[in-house]
Amino acid sequence: MSTVTRDAEGTVTGNTYDKYGSTNPVVRRLMAGFERTLDELLGRAAPNSILDVGCGEGVLVHKWAQAHPEARIVGIDLEAPDIQAGWAQHQAPNIEYRINKAENLPFADGEFALASAIEVLEHVPDPAHTVAEMARVARGGHLLVSVPREPLWRGLNMARGAYLKDLGNTPGHVNHWSKRSFVELLSRHGEVVEARSPFPWTMVLVKV
């Protein structure tokens, strides 16, 4: 089951669905490809510090902290009860969580070896500015980002009868990219190292 989530100001921020813990065999198959690609690209960057922008309940942050206990890992997201409850469940000595918007990151230039935004940029009002901020705090390192691949994503929603009044648009998605247009956006901020297409997403590693 999925639910619409809102931040402390009442703005729709997304459609919460535990895709990482789903027992649905189709979702599990899709997520296996997604996580495998994510792990491979993260391995290419081999960062010793990570800022995860829009970390949600902290599932990925916690996974990375366990896999890389020597790395400093910071997760930021909006103030929302479900998000902070998730943080309490996903703790590790090398994890730090902060309530903060993606548009203005309270970190120094080049403070992190990698900045990630996994299924986040489709939600933010100014994605180009958010990417620029991420590139600033990861200067000399990498960005690792993923978004739904359009128009495939909306087509799949409509095929299963979801969000028909909004032509398949998932609640909270205010930005939409094909693989090509997303790579073009990121290439303005650094060198695209690799762009992958785990169905039905686009995932890109960028050297900044």
Task: Give the residues covered by each predicted segment.
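Hydrophobic adenine-recognition pocket in adenosine-nucleotide-binding enzymes
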Residues: 120
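Conserved N-terminal segment of class I S-adenosyl-L-methionine
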Residues: 1-108, 131, 161, 165-185, ...
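A short glycine-rich, Lys/Arg-flanked "PGG" loop and its adjoining helix->strand segment in the class I
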Residues: 128-142
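Histidine-centered divalent metal-coordination motifs
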Residues: 123
